[in-house]
Amino acid sequence: GKDYAAVGAWRRDPIDNLSHGATPMQVARFYYLLQTGRLVNAQASAEMKELLGNSAIHHKFVKGLELTDPTAVVYRKSGTWGISHADGALVERRDGSSFIAAAIAEDPRGGQWLSQIIIQMDRLVGSGEGLPRVRRTNVPGSSGDASVSSGG
């Protein structure tokens, strides 16, 4: 962890010694807990959604979703450092479905790639009629076997 100030990092990532960092899977898990009201508790999840739902920057995932589903509600956090671009989002679509997206790109065009990736993801979710739904019965990253079932 590190404050956004000139002071040094107080707790660095144990793998790469980063002061700010999360894998796409960690980001997806965060949004899963947020959507299910288990990010601390239901009240904290609702407050966090309120904070994440007002993106003032329309790039990366938001830019792509504005083209495919401009009425979607997007809870997101993005970041850019040099040529590294990251975005993570919980997307609630106008048809009532929702999905989680998380991606990192290391290229000067990474922001454009993320806009294109989310367009394709949104199209896949939107065309999922008739496909069996997959349900995870435990929280990703928790201890124990992950149980995945289709249906419902």
Predicted regions and their residues:
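Structured C-terminal helix/loop/strand segments within mature extracytoplasmic catalytic/sensor domains
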Residues: D16-G152
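Short, charged, amphipathic alpha-helices and their helix-cap/turn boundaries
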Residues: G1-A6
